[in-house]
């Protein structure tokens, strides 16, 4: 039990320290999504595990509204699409959670050339979401805020010809 005021871990480490296949898969995800370390991946896996656990609990209950609220919440943050239901939560993968990170959305929207550059733009305060500056690459972008991504007005990156911009002409 953690003492009040002390941080607790928000993730679980793998049970076995060396499994070659798992390590190769984690390394691939780290490079594909521009994650800093495996802790970020383990956090996403723990978040997904919590979603699945909640879905299993809600599937066991009958006649509750909380299942619909849970699905609506996952649809708001973009992990589930509009037509998916509570059963579909069990088939989610860690990539579904990683795709909703601000760092990934900035890259997918074409504001950065690479995932690493997207991470740098976010952590250096060049990106705003819904008009407010967000400096956490792990921020989960709701679907409603996805089209409000932009460079900060005070950033040099607002210039279309800035050399660091994606697709900048030289």
UniProtKB/Swiss-Prot annotation:
Upper taxonomic lineage: Archaea, Methanobacteriati, Methanobacteriota, Stenosarchaea group, Halobacteria
Molecular function via GO: rRNA binding; structural constituent of ribosome
Example of a GO cellular component annotation carried by this entry: small ribosomal subunit
Name of the protein in its database record: Small ribosomal subunit protein uS4
GO biological process: ribosomal small subunit biogenesis; translation
Keyword Ribonucleoprotein: yes
Keyword terms of this UniProt record: Ribonucleoprotein, Ribosomal protein, RNA-binding, rRNA-binding
Key word Ribonucleoprotein present: yes
Function comment: One of the primary rRNA binding proteins, it binds directly to 16S rRNA where it nucleates assembly of the body of the 30S subunit.
